[in-house]
From Swiss-Prot:
It catalyses: L-methionyl-[protein] + [thioredoxin]-disulfide + H2O = L-methionyl-(S)-S-oxide-[protein] + [thioredoxin]-dithiol; [thioredoxin]-disulfide + L-methionine + H2O = L-methionine (S)-S-oxide + [thioredoxin]-dithiol. Keywords: Oxidoreductase. GO terms for molecular function: L-methionine:thioredoxin-disulfide S-oxidoreductase activity; peptide-methionine (S)-S-oxide reductase activity. One of its GO terms (biological process) is protein modification process. Belongs to the MsrA Met sulfoxide reductase family. NCBIfam families: msrA (TIGR00401). Its EC number is 1.8.4.11. Has an important function as a repair enzyme for proteins that have been inactivated by oxidation. Catalyzes the reversible oxidation-reduction of methionine sulfoxide in proteins to methionine. The active site is at 11. This is Peptide methionine sulfoxide reductase MsrA. HAMAP family: MsrA. Signal peptide: none annotated. It comes from the Archaea.
């Protein structure tokens, strides 16, 4: 049994690395969603002119991890109050976004954000939209943190997120 979740919380390398730590997650694919051109390239998305977001698509086993648990990790590993930026990455392609696949996912995401709002000084700006289209990113983006652990960006931004998942969500790890 497999279900799909799609989220974006800044650079997809970081979100991919964090989600891959979780038991019940079968695959995590970095890619692009939204936007107004088909099959965008990284260069096009980074230009900020296509309205795509960097996202990850997560195939998971709902008997081992629930959608709400994926949301818990998603919100713990990025700042949902930052509009169109995460850390050093600025632009609409780095926005906080949940792209739902079902009405149930949408309801869960809306309820989760409503409950979480009281825990932040600033309003949560995470967008919730129905997923219309997803394109896998170029191959060199897939498993980027795993393949490039000593990359300076990965050490500064992805590694702390992975460590947070390992320390905070020990019962959910692979």
């Amino acid at each position: 049994m497999s279900e799909t979740a799609t989220v974006g919380g800044g650079c997809f390398w970081c979100t991919e690395a964090a989600m891959k730590e979780l038991a019940g997650v079968n695959t995590v694919t970095s890619g692009y969603a939204g936007g107004d051109i088909d099959n965008p390239t990284y260069k096009q998305v980074c230009s900020g002119t296509t309205d795509h977001a960097e996202v990850v698509q997560i195939e998971y086993d709902p008997t081992k991890i629930e959608y709400s648990e994926l949301l818990e990790v998603f919100f713990a590993t990025h700042d949902p109050t930052q509009l169109n930026r995460q850390g050093p990455d600025v632009g609409t392609q780095y926005r906080s976004i949940i792209l739902t696949h079902t009405a149930e996912q949408r309801a869960t995401a809306e309820a989760y954000i409503e409950a979480l709002n009281d825990h932040y000084d600033d309003a949560i700006v995470t967008e919730i939209e129905s997923l219309e289209r997803f394109w896998s990113a170029e191959e060199y983006h897939q498993d980027y943190f795993e393949k490039n652990p000593s990359d300076a960006y990965c050490r500064m931004h992805a590694q702390p997120k992975v460590e947070k998942v390992r320390e905070t969500f020990t019962e959910k790890l692979t």
